[in-house]
A protein has these predicted regions:
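An acidic-aromatic pocket/loop used at catalytic or ligand-binding sites
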Residues: 2, 8, 25, 29-215
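Bacterial N-terminal signal peptides
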Residues: 13-25
Length: 215
């Protein structure tokens, strides 16, 4: 089972997921959809006896991710690409959660970077990455997270940075472990604003068939 994780892909596939649940007519299946004033899906829940998919859009904040908002920064809204999202998939022991929100600030990227380098220390060591390459030290957190760990190392998950407005050609800050990551990523500035995304990843457990251990 491979899940491609990206806000745009998730939001676009919600209608299909709901339709399939209704067509299949799974016993005990429950579908609940809340729409905003424009008729767009804001909250979708699909629950079955085997698990469920819960998606909330435009309701996630930095506090939900366990991070502060940069002083004076404002949430970027107004298009699908920058909608905040809280996505939870659970099927038996297979659990995945992704939360993301984008902000803009009139301050420089350097100031925002310095702020979040300090804020991320609540989750342990903080590494700085440019793409998959470390910048400075440390190059790995004490829990084993490095710049190549972006969710795609998990065979059950494909994480698309672009869908969360994280430019792989720009600086990213990371803290945590391979399974539980907090990321601050930057995109190209626009309208005089430094734009950045806050992302938390809780990835499903992966067992090493050779060692029997999990990441």
């Amino acid at each position: 089972m491979i899940r491609t994780i990206g806000r745009n892909r998730i939001l676009a596939s919600l209608g299909l997921a709901v339709s399939l649940a209704l067509v299949v007519g799974i016993s005990g299946c429950r579908v609940h959809v809340d729409k905003d004033e424009n008729g767009d899906e804001k909250k979708v829940q699909v629950d079955t006896p085997f698990g469920g998919v819960h998606v909330n859009t435009d309701q996630t904040t930095a506090a939900d991710l366990g991070l502060p908002v940069y002083p004076g920064a404002t949430e970027i809204k107004g298009d699908d690409k920058h909608k905040s999202a809280d996505v939870h998939l659970g099927f038996g022991e297979w659990e995945l959660r992704v939360r993301a929100v984008s902000y803009g600030s009139s301050d420089s990227e350097e100031k925002v970077t310095a702020f979040y380098k300090k804020a991320l220390t609540r989750y342990g060591d903080v590494i700085t990455c440019n793409g998959k390459s470390p910048v400075g030290t440390p190059t790995m957190t004490s829990e084993g997270l490095n710049c190549t760990d972006n969710g795609n190392n998990n065979p059950n998950v494909k994480f698309d940075n672009g869908d969360f407005n994280i430019d792989t050609g720009k600086i990213q800050l990371k803290a945590g472990s391979k399974r539980h990551q907090h990321i601050v990523g930057f995109e190209d500035p626009k309208d005089g604003q430094t734009r950045f995304a806050l992302v938390s990843l809780d990835l499903p457990d992966v067992v090493d068939n050779k060692s029997g251990s999990s990441d």
